[in-house]
Amino acid sequence: LMTSAYMGLRLAWGDCEVAVVPFDEIIPRVLDGTYMSGLIIHEGQLTYVEHDLHVHIDLGIWWNERTGGWPMPLGGNVVRRDLGQQAMEDITKYTKMSIEFALKSPAEALEFAKKWGRGIDDETNKEFVSMYVNDRTIDYKEEGRASVRKFIGEGQDFGLIRSDFNAADMSFIGSNE
């Protein structure tokens, strides 16, 4: 399993027992007693309260406290270097344009995002989208890039990321780094 949420869980709790299930089945399986707890992702981060579930750990807060305020890296867009510099820059440019459009046209962007909202109401959709489509989506900023590198380094130390990957050599296209 190679997701940033899973890696955050392992960094926070070490070697814990896990079962892999589709993300939209996590809350129902906790509610029906199949599992004692679950790693809640996507809109479940907002909707778990509707089910009277207790938070054991908020990984974002945990990472923020651990790093002195850095944001927890969740997801991200990557481009293979073998595609060449121009392709990397073009993909970055068009992705950035898409995000900027969403920020300038929130009503249209939110309507588009509803397709993937899995039944959430408009207000929850707005809150969820604003968590992941914001100024930091366009530019991680210096502390965001440092956070990504630290997260990868800790994942390597824990054995979740191959040791020959050089996070210091990682490029953030368009960041003027």
Please provide the spans of the model-predicted regions:
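Bilobed "Venus flytrap"/periplasmic-binding protein-like clamshell domains
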Residues: 1-46, 146-150
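Short, surface-exposed acidic
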Residues: 16-18, 119-128, 162-167
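Pocket-lining segment of extracytoplasmic ligand-binding domains
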Residues: 22-115
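Short secondary-structure boundary/hinge segments and terminal tails
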Residues: 29, 48, 131, 172-174
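Short secondary-structure transition/capping segments
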Residues: 65-73, 148-159
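Secondary-structure end/capping motifs
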Residues: 84-154
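Conserved C-terminal helix/tail region of periplasmic/extracytoplasmic solute-binding proteins
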Residues: 154-177
